[in-house]
């Protein structure tokens, strides 16, 4: 399972990001910033996180879904940093679009090493 997320920001686009992220998690696609929790046996049975530089949490969620593992999202939420989205509204939209594009390309089979080269690792 995972926790829902929220941002301290009152920006409409951050609220939208939260809604989309929580909706996706409710459908079984969980990202690392959502505080994934899982039984040890299931973690090992799923092959643990793949050794790839990006999308390892996404791939793990896809694997769990393919295995038929049901995921839940708690009513509790995690406060997630918005630092990768800081700046103007245009910047927020550009980052959101870029991240969605990286996921789409990953699903299409593009090499995660190549995708990682384009990842804005802002931490």
Protein language model annotation of sequence segments:
Residues 41-45, 77, 84:
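Short, well-ordered alpha-helical scaffold segment located
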Residues 36, 54-61:
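Conserved glycosyltransferase catalytic-site signature
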Residues 32-47:
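Conserved nucleotide-sugar donor-binding
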Residues 89-118:
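Catalytic core of nucleotide-sugar-dependent glycosyltransferases
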Residues 29, 36, 71-72:
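Residues that recognize and position ribonucleotide moieties
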Residues 15-26:
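Short, glycine-/aromatic-enriched active-site segment of Class I SAM-dependent methyltransferases
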